[in-house]
């Protein structure tokens, strides 16, 4: 998902108005007393209180594995639908098999998970053990089978790799690969060295942020979007994924230093991206005498864009702080606190919104609202033993 919509997307969405249905569900009990990995600015206490019911209401969909995955990402492996764990629904209903060289491998179709290995990384991140069993088409498997299949099916060539599909695989492999034994042979006989994949990810961060780095060095706000903003959710997934790699020992001291350099830039982006978003939505705003429905839709897109970037950013910041990868300076702490206020404002603005209003007529916006709410909740309340391994 992109951080902002284009003018064409806005105009196409502007004519969409629809009714919806309601689902209910309680917050998983395990989330009530557990302590987050790190503390976040106090204003976000109220933010998570708004997000939790939005997630439990809108993410319990039996026919939408992408939404289910995000519910698990926010609430952890105990997230249920009709008393059945979403983790088991995802594995038993939506996984498929692919045959390569006479052997079957498990995978989640990309039309279900959005990006390769998004389902696997979600299961591993929330602490589902590799031994966890499930049944698919009458056959017994484990999450470990899915993890081994992902490695077997992974193909890597830095000359042709889609750098916008890398983040989810980086997370999954960082959690199941021992740094000292990070080389394997895939199903087609290609040797994969995970260190090379991590380096490619770090190179991507560097190459897509050149303009931002220049503006930061000059002490000015950017005049245009940088390339990283064209990556999914403004490149935040890639940054988080590389933090997972470094935290789990991949890439050594050089990777840690390169990541730390980017984290400094990302805190600067809390101001820079906000500046660019505000400018974009001011220019795209409908006239004051426009149809109220159009004005409301424009406002929802604006608030979701901020929810997306700042929610994903707090995932990065919370994870990096919790794993000793980031110790903000006093000035950076002030920037983070301002980002927290912006995130709270965006969430407060969508409080009470019925996301189902958009599910049939504007499914992209529906997915934005649900997914971004889930990532923001996880960033605010990243809790070991609940929604974080």
Where are the regions that the model predicts?
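N-terminal secretory signal peptides that target proteins for export/translocation
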Residues: 1-3
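Preference for long, amphipathic alpha-helical scaffolds in soluble/luminal domains
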Residues: 30-389
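N-terminal export signals
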Residues: 9-30
């Amino acid at each position: 998902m992109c951080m902002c919509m284009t003018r064409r997307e806005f105009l196409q969405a502007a004519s969409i108005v629809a009714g919806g249905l309601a689902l209910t569900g309680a917050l998983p009990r395990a989330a009530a007393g557990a302590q987050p990995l790190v503390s976040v600015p106090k204003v976000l206490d109220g933010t998570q209180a708004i997000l939790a019911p939005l997630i439990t209401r809108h993410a319990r969909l039996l026919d939408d594995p992408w939404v289910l995955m995000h519910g698990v990402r926010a609430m952890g492996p105990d997230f249920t639908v009709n008393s059945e764990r979403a983790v088991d629904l995802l594995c038993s209903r939506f996984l498929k098999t692919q045959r390569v060289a006479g052997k079957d491998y498990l995978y989640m179709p990309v039309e279900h998970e959005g990006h390769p290995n998004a389902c696997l990384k979600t299961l591993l991140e929330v602490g589902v053990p590799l031994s966890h069993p499930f049944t698919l088409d009458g056959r017994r498997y484990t999450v470990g089978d899915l993890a081994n299949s992902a490695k077997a099916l992974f193909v890597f060539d830095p000359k042709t790799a889609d750098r916008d599909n890398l983040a989810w695989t980086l997370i999954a492999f960082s959690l199941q690969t021992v740094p000292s034994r990070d080389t394997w042979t895939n199903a087609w006989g290609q040797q994969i060295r995970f260190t090379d994949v991590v380096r490619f990810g770090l190179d991507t961060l560097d190459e897509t942020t050149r303009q931002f780095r220049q503006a930061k060095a000059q002490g000015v706000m950017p005049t245009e979007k940088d390339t990283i903003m064209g990556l999914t959710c403004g490149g935040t997934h890639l940054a988080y994924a590389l933090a997972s790699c470094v935290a789990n020992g991949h890439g050594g001291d050089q990777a840690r230093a390169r990541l730390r350099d980017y984290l400094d830039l990302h805190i600067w982006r809390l101001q820079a991206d906000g500046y660019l978003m505000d400018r974009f939505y001011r220019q795209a705003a409908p006239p004051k005498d426009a149809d109220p429905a159009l004005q409301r839709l424009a406002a929802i897109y604006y608030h979701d864009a901020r929810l997306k970037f700042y929610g994903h950013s707090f995932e990065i910041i919370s994870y990096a702080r919790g794993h000793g990868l980031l110790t903000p300076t006093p000035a950076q702490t002030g920037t983070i606190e301002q980002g927290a206020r912006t995130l709270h404002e965006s969430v407060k603005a969508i409080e009470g919104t019925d996301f189902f209003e958009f599910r049939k007529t504007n499914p992209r916006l529906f997915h934005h609202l649900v997914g971004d709410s889930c990532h923001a909740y996880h960033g605010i309340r990243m809790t070991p033993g609940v929604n974080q391994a």
